């Protein structure tokens, strides 16, 4: 069995985490298994389900700049102790560099960098994240993204055109199928009657691009 290590912040109900769980639930777990390397020291919403599916959750030292040497050592120790892990699938915006570099130093043969965004958050950590972003292509063996624009932003156009892979976010369509009784209940609850309703399911964050919807 091949174990794939997913590097994330923690397994709460965010977009990346939900996408991973949608894939995980339908994975052929006789051949592949997901394990999770989390950076935040708090329980995640999906932790119990992960363990029920046979996955393991490992704690990293965190992705603060001062933790970088400890992170590299921790990653090398983890992969030495668990040779069944053959693949790293890294998320975490630009800070995924920590996991990618640690896996590279440990000699892990497959290191997937996954771009989920077309920009970096403009916060106090922006200079550090921008610096880390420049080194991701050299630390990864494979370039994945949710779309072409995100791939070009993280890896550059030439690298993306040569090696990029678009991984569509997995969605369990049965959960969102049309159900007349649910429609009637919600319309009655919110007093919508037969009005035209345009729904948008997303956090109120810049990367969700609500301005395009409003325009």
Predicted segments with their positions:
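N-terminal strand-loop element at the rim of the active site
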Residues: 2-70
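Short hydrophobic "strand-cap" motifs at the C-terminus of beta-strands
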Residues: 7-8, 146, 167-170, 200-204
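A conserved mid-protein helix/loop that constitutes part of the nucleotide-sugar donor-binding site
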Residues: 14-22, 196, 200-215
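An amphipathic, basic-hydrophobic alpha-helix
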Residues: 49-56, 61-87, 97-101, 105, ...
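A short helix/loop element that forms part of the nucleotide-sugar donor recognition site in Leloir-type
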Residues: 75-76, 177-191
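Short His-centered aromatic/hydrophobic patch
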Residues: 90-96, 115
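A conserved, positively charged/aromatic
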Residues: 105, 112-146, 157-160
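A short, active-site helix/loop in glycosyltransferases that binds the activated sugar's phosphate group
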Residues: 139-177
